[in-house]
Regions:
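Glycan-recognition and catalytic cores of secretory/periplasmic carbohydrate-active enzymes
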Residues: 1-170
């Protein structure tokens, strides 16, 4: 909003929010209850924190930029801990298993709801930026895993994912 409207009060509000996120969430690794459907730790809270710090780093310079980048990095590591690095062996007869779904690269939602989803939004861009900034190719590599994993449920002829119609994403 600061850049879009060229209004410094939006930057000040974002900086105060970042201070709060650092003090109450990131420094404590207390990514808790940031969704409407969970009252427990969840990856979404860390995604929000990482993304907020990413955008602040993009509009900052010098030590301030480094601070936001480091906070983004810390929140991103937590977020990544929720992403599957293996394929869950589904029991025979489960639709997603029968359709060959591979869970590697999918994010678990929360300990309360314990299901996978494709909730990522701009986190891929955040990870690619961190990869370049910190010379850490694993971030970029994992973005590729996440991206390819999400595309496996895109329906096409002879691969309708069990419930889909052409062009419909289940």
């Amino acid at each position: 909003a600061y850049r879009y409207f060229n209004n410094p009060k939006y930057l000040t509000a974002a900086q105060k929010t970042a201070d709060y996120l650092e003090r109450e969430i990131i420094s404590k690794a207390d990514y808790f209850s940031s969704t409407l459907d969970a009252n427990c730790e969840d990856k979404e809270a860390s995604l929000y924190a990482a993304t907020a710090m990413y955008y602040l780093a993009l509009i900052s310079t010098g030590e301030e930029q480094q601070r936001y980048a480091d906070l983004c990095l810390k929140a991103s590591y937590f977020a990544l801990s929720w992403y599957y690095l293996w394929d869950v062996p589904f029991a025979q007869g489960q639709m997603i298993g029968d359709n060959g779904l591979q869970t590697r690269g999918w994010g678990n939602v929360s300990v309360e709801n314990n299901h996978i989803d494709v909730f990522i939004f701009e986190f891929g861009s955040v990870l690619n930026w961190l990869s370049k900034r910190y010379n850490e190719p694993r971030f970029h590599d994992f973005v590729q895993v996440i991206s390819s994993s999400m595309r496996q449920l895109l329906p096409f002829e002879n691969h309708m994912c069990g419930v889909a119609k052409t062009g419909y994403y289940p």
